Amino acid sequence: MFSKDTYVNRRARLAKEVGDGVLLFLGNNHVGMNYEGNEYNFRQDSCFLYFFGLDYAGLTAVMDLDAGEEIIFGDELTIDDIVWTGTMPSLSENARKVGIGKTLPLSALKEYLGKAMRQGRKIRFLPPYRADHKVRLMDLLGILPGVQSLHADEVLIRAIVDLRIHKTAEEVAIIEEAVDVSTRMHLEAYRLARPGVHEAEIAAAVLQIASSRPGGGLAFPTIATVAGQVLHNHGFIHTLREGDIFLLDAGAENADHYCGDLSSSMPVSERFTPRQEEIYQLHLRSFQAAVDQLRPGNPYRNAHLAAAEAIAEGMVDLGLMKGCPRDIAESGAYALVFPCGTGHMMGLDVHNMENLGEQYVGYAEGEKKSTQFGFKSLRLARPLEPGFVFTVEPGIYFIPELIDLWKAEGRFKEFINYDKFEAWKDFGGLRNELDYLITEDGCRVLGTLKKPMTLEEVYTAKNL
């Protein structure tokens, strides 16, 4: 947790930005996996954590800007609870730790909100992403689940995004702790990736590192695969073989729930094959092209376009594409081998604030998302500002199904040599990913440990 003053100041800034109304924050509850008592690991809602800091289930918070009061609603433990959990601080004790002096039982929440609505006051809430939140909002506010997101308050959303998107020095230090744990996870994967090893063994090893500190764990489900052309491959069903490329996309979340997110691509053999080295080096050029665009005021869309153009240039050099690389990038033809975005915001969520809406988080007000394949997957396009924390992760993927579909449809025939692609359909895919902070005059990589990137660094890491 942060200091009490941190939470008080965050709420004061939010109140000033929003101005009026009743702000409703639903904390998360326990959720059963296959029956009610067998629960998924609890994860508190990130906005609740940011403003109220209390990391346990069964809480709802209200900021009544009209009345000038803040309340946490929740129930005290009964003796039946204490038998299973042990003695815990009371709700009022916990509330005082974050600067809130008033608590009420959960049963009082519906009447509190009902009275405000009868007075004609506005209840401001965030888009729900859990089924139980949708049921609660229907009960509390009478809004059907199918239209709740339409009633979510844009003023509140934009105010929260503006606060959470700019990281303080204290937040950056905590994020770097998570990034360092993430780096150790990846260094272990370089050591373990050998012929005969199962993907699941490496996934288990990185989980152990992520979980080895109190309160720590994974920031998201690990991707550990030799089928890198499948962008989100969580199956862990393969055994590593000579000549494979092993891809790890994994990150740690620390006790404060800030995240790291890294990706690594490495040879299962001692070295990449010449063809693999060629694509890996092309990938590094695209990565550096994106990084060269990272500075205050420059839209992140330009970083994506720079990475796409570098990949297009490499595809032309290989004879897989033809024409002007810039035209290939702007047309969208590059997306045959790079169908996703270059990065995303990161913080308390690995895709930071994605529940609030990508349009608000990743795009400037009034800026429209592209509908073009490839560009439509940009989670981040807005002009960069000091304090932004985000990932950079261009990749190159040879996806047989996508190649076959585009060839059959005759898409971008003026740019793509489909016959040449036939020999590459068994290549797979690769990417690397690092986490960055925008500074006053540029950017810097987050973390005190170095993740291997160059061929020399990769080969050294595999032989430690």
Where in this protein do the model-derived segments appear?
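Active-site neighborhoods and metal-handling regions in enzymes and metal-associated proteins
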Residues: 1-464
